[in-house]
Amino acid sequence: MKRPVFTGLCTALVTPFRGDHVNYEMLERLIERQIRAGADAIVLAGTTGESPTLTNEEKLEIFRLGVECARGRCKIIAGTGSNSTAKAVELSVQASRLGVDGLLAVTPYYNKATQPGLIAYYKAITDAAGIPVIAYNVPSRTGVDISVDTCGKLTKMEHLAGIKEACGEIGRAHV
């Protein structure tokens, strides 16, 4: 990691629904409200945004809407992680093409990747997307923890912009 790409207030938004469908009108209002409140960046389709319940088509529309609404007034970070490296790479590339400023990629869940597997996963995403990526370590949700040693290796990746550490161990915040 060279220098911070994302600084200041970064809000992880919920994904509003109306019935069984994403409420894009309400999402636009939520984005606008966060921008007016001073958000420096907004995360769309992360854990708070119910990413596992969304289709890729819904995610891409959410990202497109986010970029359109923000109009450069704040950065848009797209949640593109998956339990499938190929799917995470594909969604990351598509999000990048839509003009998002960065990606939040949760560790692959369910499959309990090895540490070398995590490195390969993040390398595939960072190499393919070509924009800043934040690795998201949340072992309580994914079943796998990015080790301190692996964090050190990830920081050497050109496009890795940071690590969102949610393992519950405050002592790891210095990594």
Report residues per predicted region.
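Catalytic beta/alpha-barrel core
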Residues: 103, 135, 158-169
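Active-site beta->alpha loop and helix N-cap motifs at the rims of alpha/beta catalytic domains
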Residues: 2-11, 15-145, 151
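Active-site glycine-rich loop that binds ribose-phosphate moieties when present
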Residues: 146-150, 155, 167-170
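Conserved small/polar residues in nucleotide/adenosyl-binding loops
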Residues: 173-175
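Acidic-histidine catalytic/liganding microenvironments
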Residues: 73, 157-158
